[in-house]
UniProtKB/Swiss-Prot annotation:
Database matches in InterPro entries: Papilloma_E5_alpha (IPR004270)
Protein name (record): Probable protein E5
Keyword terms of this UniProt record: Early protein
Domain of life where this protein originates: Viruses
Length: 91
């Protein structure tokens, strides 16, 4: 019976945290940018481009379950909150 060494390094942890860090950074930057923009068409374009960036990053860096959970928690819910805030302030 052979002993097979198992590499328990931080590579697996950092690789699994990378999509979360990228998503949080993009989310914060995009929300700050969107809140500073008062014109609705520019806001909508920024929101759509941000969502496309999320989708590309998460498809490349995550498993399907992580992709689904990150998309719900960090993409659509904050975008919906910002969208509602802007609609309320424009009335």
């Amino acid at each position: 019976m052979e002993f097979i060494p198992v590499d328990v390094s931080t590579q697996a942890t950092s690789k699994s945290l990378l999509p979360l860090v990228i998503a949080l950074t993009v989310c914060v930057v995009s929300i700050i940018t969107i809140l500073c923009i008062s014109e609705f068409l520019v806001y909508t374009n920024v929101l759509v481009l941000t969502l496309i960036l999320y989708v590309l990053l998460w498809l490349l860096l995550t498993t399907p379950l992580q992709f689904y959970l990150l998309t719900l928690s960090l993409c659509f819910l904050p975008a919906l909150c910002v969208h509602q805030y802007i609609l309320q302030t424009q009335e």
